[in-house]
């Protein structure tokens, strides 16, 4: 028996033939993939460069030739967020150089989806069934829907990943909305069936009813009824999976590309924007005198420092820290010594005052002692959080304990504060969103001296949910990265609203990267207490240093200045 490649007179065993065939296949396999040429090339290059770490050099060389990592699966876990509420963590696993690895994870605030508007954190905890349903549904979506569909996707393809997430959420939202409508219709039918038939009416009854109706009409002439609260927007249980997966994919892409997350988000938004990087101006919650404080005053939920865009991040933080120390020193004096002082949930100084003037006078005194430029490089915003102050039984706002004011009376209070303290340049949520007449009247009264911002009074939504216009007179909405919003939703919302404020929630420091990458103008991080908040401030400082002081540079697109007549007061937003 002879075999090609061997002498004709030789005899080759079956094992030798198989081994020879195997060697030929191996040689062909390596030749077809260019392995000999690449090995020869890297060995030649390495010889001339003579690196200290030979195998590290080889590893880097061949890593550059490996396939692009793709998503292999997405997993979900139930965790706790920064406020101790249950939340969903999404983790992205990729095939990297033939091995499956967990690359990055992301946790979204667990309190948003499936919960009614205006619910406080304590109420969320008591409503454990609804929260548990939302978390369970989110984990199911990740496991059964998102993971199979996104398998094989390049993590850098953020736009298409987000479209898949949004399309799925939209379909589920429409189903959920139809289900709620059917439940309401069924409830109304059951109520109608359970009602007893009307009793016979005496002949004299119409005259009495007419008289009674006349009295009612007379009373209505003098009444100014409070507009009822709008029904809460239907939340979609499980939608937190959308935001968690979208953010986890973005963080995974940045990790695999070896680039900071903010640069990757910038590239997703607009590759050309890398040349015009802009840092947001940090605004700091310096004091809280809201409902949770020990004093009678409820109205000033947050007093916020609004610095000029010319100040660097480190300068702004330094001013805020100095100001807090000085206010504490003053509070320890004889004038204020009896006032209860603590730290709010937002990480700010929490003081129990009885009147708004006391808080603003304290702040003005501290700024004067430190020679801080209050009214020039530093201005104030006041978050009134009026939606939380409404006493519906009285139809008035409880601005102080036992002191109730009508919406019209509240307009006069705000006008007086702005006239007395001209450093106040913004009021956040001065009324409920339903009090449209007072929004409009206050905007007319204060004119260009102050602008009105909507936070809780706004309804910015992901693309798959209906948005509503801002209250009349409000010049801007404060945007939040809600748990049911994708990265693309956030970028789109910011692009549609110029000179935007982004409020970071209880998430990690990646919110700062999202703010920088999405091109937001102002970043609301809360107070200067708490490790997680200071991590965010430190992250913003690190990005500023990396950008070599790009914030406030003349050739860069600067955020709007509060002193400019073409600034906030000239901006209008028709829809969120």
Swiss-Prot record:
EC number: 4.2.1.11
UniProt pathway: Carbohydrate degradation; glycolysis; pyruvate from D-glyceraldehyde 3-phosphate: step 4/5
Biological process terms in GO annotation: glycolytic process
Binding of substrate, residues: 302, 524
Superkingdom field: Eukaryota
Compositional bias annotation for Basic and acidic residues: 207-217
InterPro entries for the chain: DD_ENO4, Enolase, Enolase-like_C_sf, Enolase-like_N, Enolase_C, Enolase_N
Region (Disordered): 187-232
Biased composition (Low complexity): 196-206
Annotated CDD domains: DD_ENO4
Pfam families per record: Enolase_C (PF00113)
Leading EC class: lyase
Family membership: Belongs to the enolase family.
Name of the protein this chain belongs to: Enolase 4
Encoding gene, per UniProt annotation: eno4
């Amino acid at each position: 028996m002879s075999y090609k490649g061997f002498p004709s007179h030789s005899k080759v065993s079956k094992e030798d033939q198989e081994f020879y065939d195997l060697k030929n296949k191996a040689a062909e396999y390596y030749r077809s993939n260019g392995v000999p040429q690449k090995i020869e090339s890297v060995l030649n290059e390495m010889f001339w460069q003579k690196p200290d770490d030979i195998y590290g050099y080889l590893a880097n060389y061949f890593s550059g030739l490996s396939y692009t990592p793709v998503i292999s699966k997405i997993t979900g876990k139930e965790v706790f967020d920064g406020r101790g509420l249950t939340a969903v963590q999404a983790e992205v696993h990729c095939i990297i150089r033939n091995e499956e690895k967990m690359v990055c994870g992301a946790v979204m605030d667990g309190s948003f989806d499936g919960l009614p508007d205006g619910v406080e954190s304590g109420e969320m905890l008591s409503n454990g069934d609804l929260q548990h349903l939302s978390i369970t549904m989110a984990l199911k979506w990740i496991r059964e829907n998102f993971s199979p569909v996104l398998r094989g996707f390049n993590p850098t393809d953020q736009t298409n990943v987000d479209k898949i997430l949004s399309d799925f959420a939209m379909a589920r939202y429409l189903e959920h909305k139809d289900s709620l409508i059917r439940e309401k219709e069924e409830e109304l039918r059951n109520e109608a069936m359970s009602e007893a038939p009307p009793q016979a009416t005496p002949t004299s009854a119409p005259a009495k009813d007419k008289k009674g109706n006349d009295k009612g009409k007379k009373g209505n002439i003098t009444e100014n009824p409070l507009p009822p609260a709008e029904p809460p927007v239907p939340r979609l249980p499980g939608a937190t999976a959308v935001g968690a997966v979208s953010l986890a994919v973005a963080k995974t892409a940045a990790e695999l590309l070896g680039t900071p997350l903010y640069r990757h988000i910038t590239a997703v938004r607009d590759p050309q924007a890398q040349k015009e990087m802009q840092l947001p101006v940090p605004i700091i919650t310096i004091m809280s005198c809201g409902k949770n404080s020990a004093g009678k005053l409820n109205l000033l939920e947050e007093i916020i420092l609004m610095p000029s865009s010319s100040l660097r991040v480190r300068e702004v933080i330094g001013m805020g820290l100095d100001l807090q120390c000085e206010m504490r020193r003053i509070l320890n004096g004889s004038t204020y010594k009896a006032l209860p002082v603590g730290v709010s949930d937002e990480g700010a100084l929490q003081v129990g005052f009885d009147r708004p003037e006391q808080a603003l006078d304290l702040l003005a005194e501290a700024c004067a002692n430190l020679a801080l430029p209050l009214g020039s490089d530093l201005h104030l915003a006041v978050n009134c959080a009026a939606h939380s102050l409404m006493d519906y039984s009285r139809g008035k706002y409880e601005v102080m304990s036992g002191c109730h004011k009508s919406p019209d009376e509240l307009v006069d209070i705000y006008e007086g504060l702005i006239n007395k303290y001209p450093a106040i340049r913004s009021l956040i949520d001065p009324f409920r969103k339903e009090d449209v007449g007072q929004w409009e009247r206050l905007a007319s009264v204060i004119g260009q001296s102050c602008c009105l911002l909507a936070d809780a009074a706004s309804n910015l939504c992901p693309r798959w949910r209906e948005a509503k216009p801002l209250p009349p007179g409000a010049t801007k909405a404060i945007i939040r990265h809600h748990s049911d919003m994708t990265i693309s939703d956030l970028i789109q919302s910011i692009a549609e609203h110029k000179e935007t404020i982004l409020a970071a929630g209880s998430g990690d420091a990646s919110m700062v990267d999202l703010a920088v990458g999405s091109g937001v103008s102002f970043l609301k991080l809360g107070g200067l207490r708490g490790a997680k908040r200071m991590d965010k401030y430190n992250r913003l400082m690190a990005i500023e240093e990396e950008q070599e002081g790009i914030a406030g540079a003349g050739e860069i697109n600067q955020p709007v200045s509060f002193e400019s007549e073409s600034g906030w007061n000239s901006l209008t937003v028709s829809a969120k």
